[in-house]
């Protein structure tokens, strides 16, 4: 049996919602824990303003990958106000449709399509702020209403970086210079086309950002206090609903964040760097709380010293762990991660960036062009968030900086 298109699946989901007595108000596209947390925060904010919304959640995680969230994690699912669809399972997306987005902005309504009555309030297309949704999502959303508004949700650090630079990294994975050149040309041409489409959509459809910062440009973006407030409310709500004590005491601890970038970097280089970082944490008189990346294969995890606490529970995000804690960590060390950014903005927890150390080791070990480009991008990213992430250029500085932060904590 063939899998239906997204538009067909969305129309069926609308009929399902209407059968339960709800009007569809939004179509959401995302795949991560942060996406769902941000969606829940936005839905809670709207409910506080007296607008309780119902809608369709499209989990567009890649085929074969484990979903990062459950349907019941979404606000309103237990009340029957949410229908969840998964790409490759409940629907398929016509990828090239993005190129035809201009013609979709005012699409004809097919005779088999149910047009949502937008006389009372708008219909929302909600997506992560890293790029833009595929044209098929626009087609599905526009089949519901001409009165369309877009909500771009927080994607973490990726929200503030160029998606083109990320795509270029994958081109560098090609060993053949010819294939690499062809892929680079293809990506650059596609980036120009998408930028043109972005301009069209931004002029035709109102877009509202709901993320850590109010703007994406500049070296010192303004914090969105509304987002911070509602995300913290979400953390507290989830904690109270769990009915168990999830709090940890992070006093005297430094959180070290694992990574899952074995496509670009030799894991032995990362492991060696982490072991040196752990030694520096100990030299500062502090303890390491190691958080492996949820997507990091267990076979890649290096042998840790016995005094290092390892958190191997991916059901809670780092941000949730910190929110629930009875005492906050001294610092968060990593490669310009979202947890460092949110930790700094939400709770004033210092971030320590070690991307320069990684880049130096990659160059010393004659890492490939993809590894060098990858680490260069990390270094540039850390530099952009210098207000929240202290970029370290020598391993010895880590213990010095940590001692300074620990002394501030004691005051």
Residue ranges of each PLM-predicted region?
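Conserved catalytic-core segment of nucleotide-activated headgroup transferases in glycan assembly
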Residues: 231-298
């Amino acid at each position: 049996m063939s899998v239906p298109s997204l538009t067909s699946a969305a129309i069926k989901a609308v009929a399902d919602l209407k059968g339960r007595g709800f009007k569809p108000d939004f179509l959401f596209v995302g795949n991560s824990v942060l996406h769902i947390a941000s969606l829940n925060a936005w839905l809670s904010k709207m409910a506080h303003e007296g607008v309780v919304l119902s809608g369709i959640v499209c989990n567009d995680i890649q085929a074969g990958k484990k979903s990062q969230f459950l349907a019941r994690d979404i606000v309103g699912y237990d009340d029957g106000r949410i229908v969840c669809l998964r790409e490759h399972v409940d629907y398929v997306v016509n990828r090239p449709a993005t190129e035809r987005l201009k013609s979709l902005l005012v699409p004809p309504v097919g005779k088999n399509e149910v047009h949502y009555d937008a006389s009372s309030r708008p219909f929302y297309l909600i997506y992560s702020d890293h790029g833009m949704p595929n044209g098929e999502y626009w087609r599905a959303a526009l089949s519901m209403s001409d009165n369309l508004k877009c909500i771009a949700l927080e994607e973490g650090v990726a929200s503030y970086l160029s998606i083109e630079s990320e795509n270029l990294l994958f081109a560098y994975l090609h060993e053949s210079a010819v294939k690499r050149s062809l892929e680079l040309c293809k990506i650059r041409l596609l980036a120009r086309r998408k930028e043109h489409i972005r301009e069209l959509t931004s002029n035709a459809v109102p877009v509202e950002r709901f993320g850590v910062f109010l703007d994406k440009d500049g070296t010192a973006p303004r914090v969105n206090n509304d987002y911070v407030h509602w995300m913290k409310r979400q953390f507290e709500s989830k904690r109270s609903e769990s009915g168990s004590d999830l709090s940890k005491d992070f006093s005297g601890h430094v959180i070290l964040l694992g990574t899952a970038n074995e496509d670009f970097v030799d894991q032995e280089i990362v492991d060696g760097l982490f072991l040196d970082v752990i030694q520096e944490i100990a030299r500062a008189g502090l303890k390491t709380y190691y958080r492996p990346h949820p997507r990091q294969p267990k076979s890649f995890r290096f042998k840790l010293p016995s005094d290092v606490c390892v958190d191997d529970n991916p059901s809670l995000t780092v941000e949730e762990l910190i929110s629930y804690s009875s005492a906050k960590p001294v610092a968060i060390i990593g490669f310009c991660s979202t947890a460092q950014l949110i930790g700094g903005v939400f709770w004033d927890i210092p971030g320590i960036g070690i991307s320069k150390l990684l880049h130096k080791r990659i160059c010393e070990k004659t890492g490939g062009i993809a590894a060098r480009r990858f680490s260069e991008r990390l270094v540039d990213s850390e530099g952009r968030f210098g207000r929240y992430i202290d970029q370290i250029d020598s391993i010895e500085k880590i213990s010095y900086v940590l001692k300074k932060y620990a002394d501030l904590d004691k005051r």
